[in-house]
UniProtKB/Swiss-Prot annotation:
Naturally occurring in which organism (per UniProt): Methanosarcina barkeri (strain Fusaro / DSM 804)
Principal localisation: membrane
Keyword Phosphoprotein: no
Annotated disulfide bonds: none
Protein name stated in the entry: A-type ATP synthase subunit C
Residues covered by region (Disordered): 1-25
Amino acid sequence: MRLLEKLWGQKPSRKSDKKKNGTSNYPYAVTRVRAMKSKLLPKESYPRLLNMGIDGITRFIQESEYKNDVNELAMKYSGGDLAEHALNRNLALTYDKLVRITGGELNYLVVAYLKRYDIWNIKTLLRGKIYNASAEDIMESLIAAGEFTYTSMSELAAKATYKEIIEALKYSEYYPLLQKFDGTNLAYIENELDKMYYTGLFGAIGKPRSKDRKLFLKVVRLEVDVKNLINLFRLKKAGVMQLDEIMPLMIEGGLELKPEKLATLPYDEFVNELQRTQYWDVISGVTSSDMTSLTTLESRLTRYYLESSTVLSHVSPISVAPILDYIIHKHNEATNLRIIFRGKETGLSDELIKDQLVVI
């Protein structure tokens, strides 16, 4: 059987177009998701985790919603590797559950949103091969939460070269873009994959007429703004000022920012222009021209995005918004735990680890 024929072999629901077929089951799905969100780690857990060693943190999550994942993988992995695989497994199973409990238009929107994990996995596979990582090391970072199955990704990770991976994806929608990868332009390919994802997601949302889709669109557009703003700060700090260098790195469809207007402004003027946006109160204290790290700025913007998704989920409580809010917060929890594990493993101070966390 061809690899591409197996990519969605275990997840047929991920490939079905339910945009017009089937019945959306909002009350049932939202009730289930609210129960799932109530099981996310409370913010009070994180100071405790920072005071623990790796073994203690592993025992802690083993007593939480990650219990089955840790137990399932404990015979094969240990330490940070165990945590990485357990977190990824839990994310995949959690999101797969969301696909199974949603129907109709709701399912269609959830599936479209989760395709971001296919983009993540393709990037990880290419990056791994370029840097000669082992198949095992590559698998540690893959998350089977999109349309690709764990088995198919294992086969891709086992390929000898990035060219073989691209050839295995010959019949996928990503192949025309991946053909442009020559082994030296990874940053370009990764950026184009991101833009491809958002173009597809905006296409799935369409021209929103219902309150439901308008909220969905607003959350996605806010995310695009946050991504573009972080990239603009990186480029400004790196001294990149040319419009033709900056605009190819921007994602279209943001909520408020106009990257083409901000791109060529000197740093001080760029910051002044941001004072007119909703993001200024969030970042005003961390935009000095002599700042050496963007970690705090990124954390604040991510927190704002998370908080905004929650606010919007309350605007329309029986809609896709609470489900999208849960997906976002679940991902953030896994990211926080991964940062703690890896930080402890590499000997980072608790203060440095804490600075990277986004705790709501």
